[in-house]
Amino acid sequence: MTKIVRSKYKASRRLGVSLWGDSKDAFNTRNYRPGQHGQNTMIKTSDYGLHLKAKQRLKCHYGRVTEKQFRNIFALAQKMKGNTGENFIGLLESRLDTVVYRMNIAPTIFAARQLVSHGHIKLNGKKADIASIRLKAGDVIEVKESVKQIPLIQESVSKQGQTTPGYLSFDVPSLTGKYLRVPALSDVPYPFEAEVHLVIELYSR
C-alpha cells in the first residue's frame, strides 16, 4: 500500500467518515480515530471543531486541493448570483480532475489528478493537463488513445456497481464523456453527509 493510500485512509479515520466510499478504507473496520486514544468516545467537540471538521471532510474529499485554493473557490462562490453553498459545490464539481473521477475513469480522486497532470486526458479534443480547469456545459472529456488500455483505467471503468451522476454522461467503450450541467448539492454522490452550511458559516466568520 502506497504512502498516499495509507495517509488518505488515515484521514478517513481521523475525520470520522469514509471520505471516498472505498471498500478498502480502514474506517470500515476501525471507525475511530488513529492513535492510542482513538477509541475514547468521551472527547467533546466544540462548535468550532464541528465546523472545522465539516470543512476538512469536504476539502479532503477533493484530494490535493490546498486550503488557499479551497478558500478562493469559496470566495468566488460568494460573488456569484444564487445560493453560495450550491455555487461552491458546483465549482468544486466542475474541476477537471473531479469530473474524471466522477466518470470512473480513475479509481480515486488522486489517480484522476495524476492522469490529468500527466497529459492523459483531452478536453474538447485538446490535451488538458491542469487539474483545476473549470468545465462548462457541453465540454467533452476523452482519454488519450495511447493510454486507453492501461490497467488502472480499464479496471476502474469496468468495476461493477458504478454509476455516472446525472450531470455527466460517459460512454465506456470509447472512454468519452460529457459535462452536461452544473450539479446541485443533492446530485453529488458523496459517501458521507456534506455539511456545506457549516463550511459557509466557518468561512463567513
From Swiss-Prot:
Residues 94-157 form the S4 RNA-binding domain. PROSITE patterns: RIBOSOMAL_S4, S4. The keyword Ribosomal protein applies. CDD domains: S4. SUPFAM superfamilies: Alpha-L RNA-binding motif (SSF55174). GO terms for cellular component: small ribosomal subunit. It comes from the Bacteria. Keywords: Ribonucleoprotein, Ribosomal protein, RNA-binding, rRNA-binding. Pfam families: Ribosomal_S4, S4. GO terms for biological process: ribosomal small subunit biogenesis; translation. GO terms for molecular function: rRNA binding; structural constituent of ribosome. One of the primary rRNA binding proteins, it binds directly to 16S rRNA where it nucleates assembly of the body of the 30S subunit. With S5 and S12 plays an important role in translational accuracy. Part of the 30S ribosomal subunit. Contacts protein S5. The interaction surface between S4 and S5 is involved in control of translational fidelity. NCBIfam families: PRK05327.1, rpsD_bact. Belongs to the universal ribosomal protein uS4 family. This is Small ribosomal subunit protein uS4. It comes from Rickettsia massiliae (strain Mtu5). The lineage of its organism: Bacteria, Pseudomonadati, Pseudomonadota, Alphaproteobacteria, Rickettsiales.
